[in-house]
Structures are given as structure tokens and as C-alpha cells.
A protein has these predicted regions:
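Sequence-structural signature of mature extracellular/luminal beta-sheet repeat domains
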Residues: 25-337
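Extreme N-terminal basic, low-complexity initiation segments
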Residues: 2-9
Length: 337
């Protein structure tokens, strides 16, 4: 073990050996490195650092869009029902929501954990919330006559369109195949970009918006889709299963969740089981891992001065935490760009 490292003050490092073509570095975070902003959240996800200092997020189990103030006080912005999962600010300042339709839940002393499609499943959908009034509009429920089953994460491009993942739903004896889609913010156009994708979760754009990154949950793989233009992918030939370029896969059992991109182009992937944030350098295929005390570390966003503060959801324990970050996050369209 070694303490400190250039750019990572206060972190404790444990170096691991080179595995195949990837260099895995484990960084164990000590308690003084993060601040708990809010507790008692019902499986928080999808944080957005707003300009007023508040954090907008969803509570999947509670079915709400929630605002967390810097004091930790929580306000319900909208009652959405189902399973609001990922959010993004779009043109006009409205909040676009990926709603997966709901989960069954397992609750124990560690907190909440989503499981199967529930009897109360309300269908997958993209919703739009007016942040001033809390009014909710359903924008999309299907693509080419096929229902959305479990929309998960979302990112806007500079042209006003958005990419989102449809992870699908898992039932006791079968499950849906996932896909990645592109749609316009006004509800006029939606298309499938890649399918089948194995439970696609986090999505994010490279700084120049020429690459769409997609994280698969059960495989713990990160894929890159090269974009010819907004909503159009230059697909890789077989044996790529869906046209994406393989960037990185886990060397052990863990699962990938949502992601955010740094200003320098590195991809920060929330990692389950081995709870933490895996920081991937796409050009060299290396990864660093920062651990947090929750196996359901599900999402990360950037805010604060120079976008050098990370806000991370520890979902099983119901916490939102704040972490000083060694590099700047990427500014997002319609939010802070």
C-alpha cells in the first residue's frame, strides 16, 4: 500500500499486476475523501449537478424525480411512478427521463436491490419533466412498433438529439435483448442504432462527439460506437455482435452501470459488486478503480468549480456523496456547456 499520488491527494493505492492488454490499478478511498450529502434516498440514480448547487436525481424505488439541496434537504420535483432510471437536461431546460417501468425489490440490512420485472410493470418510456411545474409528458413508448422495455441512461448531443440505452427487463425464466437508440427531443423521430446489446446501461459522448460509449452491465464491457453524424453509426464488421468497437472488459466478476466522461476523454464507469468508479483510458485500454463503501455504486456526474467535484450515487445504502476529483469532468450540452 502507498498513500498519495500526483493528482490523487489522500487516496490509498494498491497496485495490481498487468493483466492481458489492460493495466488494472486499485485505489482504495479513505473515509475523509468524500462527504455524504444526503441519506435515506430510495435507490438514487442519474445525478445531475445543477447550476444553483443542487443535485437533481431519480429515486428508482420511490418513483420520483428528486432535488437534493446543498444542505441535504430533499424536494420531490415530480411523481413519475414506474422506475425512473437516468436523466439529462435537454433543450429548453426540461429534464428528460429514462423510465424502466419498475422493478421488484429485495430489501435487507444493506438496503435495497432491484430484481425482476414486477407485476405492476408500467412499460418502458421516455418522459419529459418541466422543472418549474413538475408536469410530466410521455415522449416515446416504442420504436417502429416495438415497445421500449427498460430505458436506462441518456445523453444529449449538440444538435438537440439524444442517445439512450434500453437495458430490457428480466423475468424469472427469460429476459429482453437490449439495444441503443437515438431520438429527437421534440418527439418527432426515434431509431435503433445497435442491437442486440447485452443489457446496455451507461451512455456518454466523447468530447468531440465522434464516439458514443456504451457500458454493458452483466459482461462489464465498455464499447465505442463511431458516429458518422448525429444518430448514425459506422458499424464494425463481424465478429462485433452489434457494430461497436471493444474498449475494455473486466478481468474478474463485476458489473458496469452508468458512466460520465472527463474533459480529457477518459470514461468514468460506475462499477457494481466491486463497488466504485472505474476510470478507463480508451486509447490505451487501461483502467484505474476507486472503491466506495457500497456494492451498488451506480452513477457519477461532475459539478462545482471547474467541474472538478464528482457527485456519486451509492444506491443500495441510499446515499449521495461528494468527492473532490483530480481532473475536470466534461461539460454537458444544455447544462453547463
Amino acid at each position: 500500500m502507498g498513500a498519495g499520488q500526483a493528482g490523487y491527494p489522500g487516496y490509498v493505492f494498491e497496485w495490481q499486476s498487468r493483466l492481458a492488454h489492460n493495466l488494472y490499478v486499485s485505489m482504495v478511498m479513505t473515509s475523509q475523501n468524500f462527504k455524504v450529502i444526503a441519506t435515506g434516498l430510495e435507490f438514487p440514480e442519474g445525478p445531475i449537478a445543477m447550476k444553483d448547487g443542487s443535485i437533481l436525481l431519480v429515486e428508482i424505488k420511490r418513483g420520483t424525480l428528486t432535488r437534493v439541496l446543498p444542505t441535504g434537504e430533499q424536494e420531490i420535483v415530480a411523481e413519475l411512478g414506474g422506475g425512473p432510471n437516468g436523466i439529462a437536461i435537454g433543450p429548453g431546460g426540461q429534464c428528460y427521463v429514462c423510465n424502466n417501468g419498475g422493478f421488484d425489490w429485495h430489501t435487507d440490512t444493506a438496503g435495497n436491490r432491484p430484481t425482476l420485472q414486477p407485476a405492476s410493470y408500467s412499460g418502458g418510456r421516455i418522459e419529459v419533466v418541466d422543472l418549474d411545474t413538475g408536469s410530466v409528458e410521455v415522449l416515446y413508448t416504442e420504436v417502429n412498433g416495438v415497445s421500449l422495455s427498460g430505458p436506462n441512461d441518456i445523453v444529449f448531443d449538440a444538435q438537440g438529439g439524444f442517445y439512450f440505452s434500453d437495458l430490457g427487463k428480466v423475468r424469472r425464466h427469460d429476459q429482453d435483448r437490449g439495444r441503443v437508440l437515438y431520438a429527437k427531443a421534440d418527439g418527432s423521430f426515434i431509431k435503433t442504432l445497435a442491437a442486440p446489446v447485452e443489457m446496455p446501461n451507461g451512455v456518454g459522448l466523447s468530447p468531440d462527439e465522434s464516439i458514443l460509449y456504451v457500458a454493458e452491465t452483466p459482461t462489464a464491457r465498455l464499447w465505442a460506437f463511431d458516429l458518422i453524424e448525429p444518430g448514425r453509426v459506422q458499424k464494425q464488421p463481424w465478429p462485433s455482435p452489434h457494430g461497436g468497437r471493444f474498449i475494455l472488459g473486466s478481468s474478474g466478476y463485476q458489473r458496469f452501470d452508468s458512466l460520465a466522461v472527463e474533459e480529457n476523454g477518459q470514461v468514468c464507469v460506475a462499477t457494481l459488486v466491486n463497488g466504485g468508479i472505474s476510470i478507463v483510458s480508451p486509447e490505451v485500454g487501461s483502467v484505474e478503480h476507486i472503491s466506495f463503501p457500497d456494492p451498488y455504486t451506480t452513477n457519477i456526474c461532475f459539478g462545482g468549480d471547474g467541474l472538478r467535484t464528482a457527485y456519486i450515487t451509492l444506491s443500495q445504502s441510499g446515499q449521495l456523496i461528494e468527492v473532490p476529483w483530480p481532473r475536470a469532468g466534461l461539460a454537458l450540452n444544455y447544462l453547463n456547456k
